[in-house]
Each structure stands twice: as C-alpha cells, then as structure tokens.
Amino acid sequence: MLKNIRFIFIFAVLCSACGQDSPKQGGGKFGMLDSGNPEFTAVEFFDHIYHSEGIDGAIKVSTPKMKRLLRSYHTNKGVQKHVLNMRFDKVTIQPRSRSAGRNEFAKEAQISIFFEGELDGDIFKDMRNVELLKVGNDWKVDEVSLE
C-alpha cells in the first residue's frame, strides 16, 4: 500500500513539473519590446496599420492629434497612402531608439522605425521617425515624419 502511494506521489510530481511554461513577457532581445516601452507602442501602431483589418488598434495608441488625422482617412490603405506615404503588401517592422537612455522613464521619445516589404513584387526599404508622448502610464504616438 505504501509503495502505491509513493508511486502515485512521484507520478503526480512528475506530471506537474511537465506543465506548460508561462508566456514570455515582452518581446525582442531581453524583453525590450515590453508594453511599457515606447518602442513597443511604435511597432504596435504600425502593426495595426499594416497587418490589421481596420485602424481602430492604431487609434487606441495615438494622441488626440494623431487620432483626428487617422480618422480622416477611414481605412488602412488610406492611412498608408496619404499619411505615411508607404504602401506594402507584406512588411516587416523593426524599431531603433534614438537615445541610449532608458526611454520608459522619459515623458517623450523619438523612435526610428525601419520597414522592409513588398509592393507588387518589388522590395522596398524605408524609415520613419515616430514621436511618442507618455500619457499616464501609456505611450501614445503623436507624430510620424521622414526626418
């Protein structure tokens, strides 16, 4: 009887040790793309514009100034063509911070976003600079520019 209980206990311990790992927090190298960082918000903004069905996700991470601009173009294609002047069929988005400091403690940040993608079979590479403001605990996209 004692052997059966010992066997069941060992079996239960082994089964519980083989459970799923908890999901990783953040993304990128060393979790740099955690949701509290401006790089994460900048990538999320463009990801909603290029990989989502609508612009609602991009509007959620925008300041009121950017929200008005995005809403005036109604669709992802309109925003891509008129606001960003970059259309892609497929695109990869990579951030690069303009400061060496810790942006998550700042009130504003400037992030360079690099795009590499396809449009009608041609490969294009481009870059945009994004200015973000910290509103409460969240980063919001305020402006997108070429410079």
Regions of interest found by a model, annotated:
Residues 14-17, 53, 97:
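N-terminal regions of proteins, emphasizing targeting and processing segments when present
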Residues 44-52, 61-69, 135-138:
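Structured segments of extracytoplasmic/periplasmic soluble domains
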Residues 99-147:
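Exposed beta-sheet edge and beta->alpha loop/turn motif
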Residues 1-16:
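Sec-dependent bacterial lipoprotein signal peptides
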Residues 18-51:
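Short, low-complexity N-terminal intrinsically disordered segments enriched in polar/charged residues
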Residues 55-106:
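Short solvent-exposed beta->alpha transition segments
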